[in-house]
Amino acid sequence: KVLNKPRLGHLRKAGVPPLRLLREFRCPVEGLEVGAELRVEQVFEPGQVVKVSGTSIGKGFQGTIKRHGFQRGPETHGSRNIRKPGSIGAAADPSRVFKGLRMAGRTGGRRVTQRGLRVVNVIPEDNLLLVRGSVPGPRGSYVEVRRER
């Protein structure tokens, strides 16, 4: 992707090459120079509790059973209501469907934060952070790791 001139100037001033992802954080380390590389061992240590944010895996258009955990209807005795959501509201009195009613739709592919994950190990040679638990997003995606307060 081509960066615009203000962003290129911002990176040039910091002495950093154009990168795929540019994020801004509060500096967790004192006395860090502009454009300096922040290593994982400077910020995290084993046993620390962190929260990890990222874009969850998109699952496309899903029904209410998969998306919201609705129960399905009976499969036998002539029922044709196996995977349908059921009633979506009252009749003539409200004369409408209330906002926010859980229905079928696009599932996943949104920002999710997994909280309370424990740092198992920090590998300084590879700049790796090992965390116990699930991390949002597909393999190879970018995540944001922050200290839990």
Describe the function of each predicted region.
Residues 1-149:
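Extended basic (Lys/Arg/His-rich) segments that typically form rRNA-contacting surfaces
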